[in-house]
From Swiss-Prot:
It comes from Staphylococcus aureus (strain bovine RF122 / ET3-1). PROSITE patterns: HEXAPEP_TRANSFERASES. Keywords: Acyltransferase, Amino-acid biosynthesis, Diaminopimelate biosynthesis, Lysine biosynthesis, Repeat, Transferase. This is 2,3,4,5-tetrahydropyridine-2,6-dicarboxylate N-acetyltransferase. It comes from the Bacteria. Belongs to the transferase hexapeptide repeat family. DapH subfamily. CDD domains: LbH_THP_succinylT.
Length: 239
């Protein structure tokens, strides 16, 4: 199983990161004689521009040239952000629109991350693992191979306090919709966590747990194969 950043390394990374407030500015007006800072990315025509820049760089620019603008619309979706979204260019996985995956998360080959899922810094999505809609992998939460994390499920993150142990999900585990796995819990290979369960302690390999708090109710071997099947076709990428 892939191991990634320690809590201390993540804390240092966030502390040292240059905080960013990127904005997108739509402008109509007279742009004659305007000089744009090198940090600006400018697109458009003679009478209309779209500018990508930092909020701190926009302020002095606007103070200088604002009288030349007729219409202004500014989009801002974060403030003093320390962690950008992950560059997925070289990620060999299926990532659907609306998934939020932060830098320093690991997405292994053949994984699937569905709409609305959130993968925080330091989290690991194992090979062939599916993170279903609106599920959350908190900081440093780690899944093995061929895991299914159901819609709305939460694997608790542990960056603060840094002494806490991360959630570890071993290979071939099924986690039902809206289940919650608390920090420090390890779910053993081939286990099944029922929908809505709240897991507060380690789950033995090959067992089924359910309830609040979750308790072992039977063995995974007693569950019909069709109810615990991992479908390879859903993880298939282009040939």
């Amino acid at each position: 199983m892939v191991q990634h950043l320690t809590a201390e390394e993540i804390i240092q990374y966030i502390s040292d990161a240059k905080k960013s407030t990127p904005i997108k500015v739509y402008l109509n007006g007279n742009f004659e004689g305007i000089t744009y800072p090198e940090s600006f990315k400018v697109f458009g025509s003679e009478q209309s521009k779209v500018i990508f820049c930092e909020a701190d760089d926009w302020k002095p620019f606007y103070e200088t040239y604002g009288s030349q603008f007729e219409d202004i619309e500014i989009e801002m979706d974060r403030r003093n952000s320390a962690i950008p979204l992950k560059d997925l260019t070289n990620t060999n996985a299926r990532i659907e629109p609306g998934a939020f995956i932060r830098e320093q998360a690991i997405i292994e080959d053949g994984a699937v991350v569905m709409m609305g899922a959130t993968i925080n810094i330091g989290a690991v999505v194992g090979e062939g693992t599916m993170i279903d809609m609106n599920a959350t992998l908190g900081g440093r939460a780690t899944t093995g191979k061929n895991v299914h994390v159901g819609a709305g499920a939460v694997l608790a993150g542990v960056i603060e306090p840094p002494s806490a142990s991360p959630v570890i999900i071993e290979d071939d585990v099924l986690i039902g919709a809206n289940a919650v796995i608390l920090e420090g819990v390890r779910v053993g290979k081939g286990a099944i966590v029922a929908a809505g369960a709240i897991v507060t302690q380690d789950v033995p390999a090959g067992t089924v747990v359910a309830g609040t708090p979750a308790k072992v109710i039977k063995q995974a071997s007693e569950v019909q194969d069709t109810k615990k099947e991992i479908v390879a076709a859903l993880r298939k990428l282009n040939d």
